[in-house]
């Protein structure tokens, strides 16, 4: 028997789990716009208060994937997404976006899934636009971009149209809900490998196990202990790694890879233009913290993509991609390729 929204709400009030099939049903009601805004708001708030379980998040992500406009990629070897939940409040430049160019230059295929900044001063969509990339592509055009350049950017509103049915509720609530952690779990290109940054240490173990349930191959979920949703230079980074169906949790430190631990304060930006300047500086091989943190994150992504056998090997490949100018050339390549689809 299917659960009613009222029964689901009662379940959250009693701090009891909503089971997989029930969560599928409720999420489909929300995504179709068949649940009232009042009930939708109550349920997603109730879930947040009781703390969402791995099963509930996995079921919600399954439905969000169902409703997405998919990008069909022919060859998914060495295929990776580099994404963060955002919401870490660090206001740094777009490290994962910069890492995309380096990772692609070193031989991986990257399907980056992102949006405009909400909590940040500059989301991935904002900085890509500032670089001259056309972010408004159809799914088949994104697939062509991945095949041709090794990179594709999926602008979230183009791929998750059903999210409009919950957008007003989320905006008015103004608090984090399950939807804040679903984005990184719902890559429309179905990248089997992922480097995912999260905004809270508890999410490391949760999100990696959700990805395990969703059938992912090689995933590293990371949380910098200075609060960053990236691999950090300013502190140790918690890692949850899914590989060969098994989950391992551990800590890594910049010194493990011959990098100096330095504060991330110098990475803060006020807007997309400042982020663009810092991103290009890193890709132009200008010495400094920006280049080092991009190298560290791209190296980790190359390990996730199975291009490198370890993070250390990935960092070496990332260094070479930047020093050779290949990473910087990838920016111009993506701009040129996407501009042909300008409407």
Curated annotation (Swiss-Prot):
Question: What domain of life does the UniProt record list for this protein's source?
Answer: Bacteria
What is a GO molecular function of this protein?
A: anthranilate phosphoribosyltransferase activity
GO CC term (a single one): cytosol
List the Pfam families hit by this protein, alphabetically: Glycos_trans_3N, Glycos_transf_3
> What are the BP-aspect GO terms?
L-tryptophan biosynthetic process
Secretion signal: which residues? Answer: none
UniProt binding sites for anthranilate 2: 170
Q: How is the cofactor bound?
A: Binds 2 magnesium ions per monomer.
- Keyword field: Amino-acid biosynthesis, Aromatic amino acid biosynthesis, Glycosyltransferase, Magnesium, Metal-binding, Transferase, Tryptophan biosynthesis
Q: Which residues bind 5-phospho-alpha-D-ribose 1-diphosphate?
A: 84, 87-88, 92, 94-97, 112-120, 124
Catalyzes what? N-(5-phospho-beta-D-ribosyl)anthranilate + diphosphate = 5-phospho-alpha-D-ribose 1-diphosphate + anthranilate
Q: Does the keyword Nucleotidyltransferase apply?
A: no
- Fetch the HAMAP family from UniProt: TrpD
Q: What does this protein do?
A: Catalyzes the transfer of the phosphoribosyl group of 5-phosphorylribose-1-pyrophosphate (PRPP) to anthranilate to yield N-(5'-phosphoribosyl)-anthranilate (PRA).
Whom does it interact with, and what assembly results? Homodimer.
User: Which family does this protein fall into?
Assistant: Belongs to the anthranilate phosphoribosyltransferase family.
Q: What is this protein called?
A: Anthranilate phosphoribosyltransferase
What is the originating organism of this protein? Burkholderia multivorans (strain ATCC 17616 / 249)
The record lists the lineage as: Bacteria, Pseudomonadati, Pseudomonadota, Betaproteobacteria, Burkholderiales
